[in-house]
Amino acid sequence: MAQAGRTGYDNREIVMKYIHYKLSQRGYEWDVGDVDAAPLGAAPTPGIFSFQPESNPTPAVHRDMAARTSPLRPIVATTGPTLSPVPPVVHLTLRRAGDDFSRRYRRDFAEMSSQLHLTPFTARGRFATVVEELFRDGVNWGRIVAFFEFGGVMCVESVNREMSPLVDNIALWMTEYLNRHLHTWIQDNGGWDAFVELYGPSVRPLFDFSWLSLKTLLSLALVGACITLGTYLGHK
């Protein structure tokens, strides 16, 4: 596989296509448009639901409420360094890893979905609290996969609760977090190419992932207006 160089691949593309995949598994068709046509390093372009599941669309006044009530800083679109297109095998390997993870912890994810209590006012705070806890003790590939699965759960739950505009916000927050907090670790550990080489279909089954042999604490506790997700404990 061709190396992407120090700058790596476009995290925005990885996020958008992963969310599209997770929503399509539930029968929701989220059209992300031509991801590759957007300026590399820019903020994600909003997606469009070709099948709009909500009978009462979220009022426009609420669509930006999550961003305004979040402890995270708003993302600013920039024209950063040139990034390499993401090879299809990266998307495929990440999808397989996410599916394997969700199968192993199906009951936990179902419980998490029922306790998220997402609203346009709370969504970004929920996201920030969970992600902070997830990476509190460090980064590894297992936690990165869990990060993508959690984002997918939030998107599906948003559509289920007739708040589909939140999906675009969640994609933005995920891209922002990857760029600001995970990109350096990913590059220092061989980039997404290393992820594929370590855990791709031609190497070993996903069920043999050492970081999926988790002593998992996937518990949700509501404390006031915040939600805490126990860290997915894993090892590289």
From Swiss-Prot:
One of its GO terms (biological process) is response to toxic substance. A motif (BH4) lies at residues 10-30. GO terms for molecular function: BH3 domain binding; channel activity; channel inhibitor activity; DNA-binding transcription factor binding; identical protein binding; molecular adaptor activity; protease binding; protein heterodimerization activity. The modification Phosphoserine is found at residues 70, 84. A motif (BH2) lies at residues 184-199. A motif (BH1) lies at residues 133-152. CDD domains: Bcl-2_like. A motif (BH3) lies at residues 90-104. The modification Phosphothreonine is found at residue 69. It is a single-pass membrane protein. The record marks 64-65 as: Cleavage. InterPro entries: Apop_reg_Bcl2 (IPR013278), Bcl-2-like_sf (IPR036834), Bcl-2_BH1-3 (IPR046371), Bcl-2_fam (IPR026298), Bcl2-like (IPR002475), Bcl2/BclX (IPR004725), Bcl2_BH1_motif_CS (IPR020717), Bcl2_BH2_motif_CS (IPR020726). Keywords: Apoptosis, Autophagy, Cytoplasm, Endoplasmic reticulum, Membrane, Mitochondrion, Mitochondrion outer membrane, Nucleus, Phosphoprotein, Transmembrane, Transmembrane helix, Ubl conjugation. The keyword 4Fe-4S does not apply. The chain crosses the membrane at residues 209-230. Pfam families: Bcl-2, BH4. Phosphorylation/dephosphorylation on Ser-70 regulates anti-apoptotic activity. Growth factor-stimulated phosphorylation on Ser-70 by PKC is required for the anti-apoptosis activity and occurs during the G2/M phase of the cell cycle. In the absence of growth factors, BCL2 appears to be phosphorylated by other protein kinases such as ERKs and stress-activated kinases. Phosphorylated by MAPK8/JNK1 at Thr-69, Ser-70 and Ser-84, which stimulates starvation-induced autophagy. Dephosphorylated by protein phosphatase 2A (PP2A). Proteolytically cleaved by caspases during apoptosis. The cleaved protein, lacking the BH4 motif, has pro-apoptotic activity, causes the release of cytochrome c into the cytosol promoting further caspase activity. It is found in: Mitochondrion outer membrane; Nucleus membrane; Endoplasmic reticulum membrane; Cytoplasm. One of its GO terms (cellular component) is BAD-BCL-2 complex. Belongs to the Bcl-2 family. Forms homodimers, and heterodimers with BAX, BAD, BAK and Bcl-X(L). Heterodimerization with BAX requires intact BH1 and BH2 motifs, and is necessary for anti-apoptotic activity. Component of the complex, at least composed of LRPPRC, BECN1 and BCL2; the interactions prevent BECN1 from forming an autophagy-inducing complex with PIK3C3. Interacts with EI24. Also interacts with APAF1, BBC3, BCL2L1, BNIPL, MRPL41 and TP53BP2. Binding to FKBP8 seems to target BCL2 to the mitochondria and probably interferes with the binding of BCL2 to its targets. Interacts with BAG1 in an ATP-dependent manner. Suppresses apoptosis in a variety of cell systems including factor-dependent lymphohematopoietic and neural cells. Regulates cell death by controlling the mitochondrial membrane permeability. Appears to function in a feedback loop system with caspases. Inhibits caspase activity either by preventing the release of cytochrome c from the mitochondria and/or by binding to the apoptosis-activating factor (APAF-1). Also acts as an inhibitor of autophagy: interacts with BECN1 and AMBRA1 during non-starvation conditions and inhibits their autophagy function. The BH4 motif is required for anti-apoptotic activity and for interaction with RAF1 and EGLN3. This is Apoptosis regulator Bcl-2. It comes from Cricetulus griseus (Chinese hamster). The lineage of its organism: Eukaryota, Metazoa, Chordata, Craniata, Vertebrata.
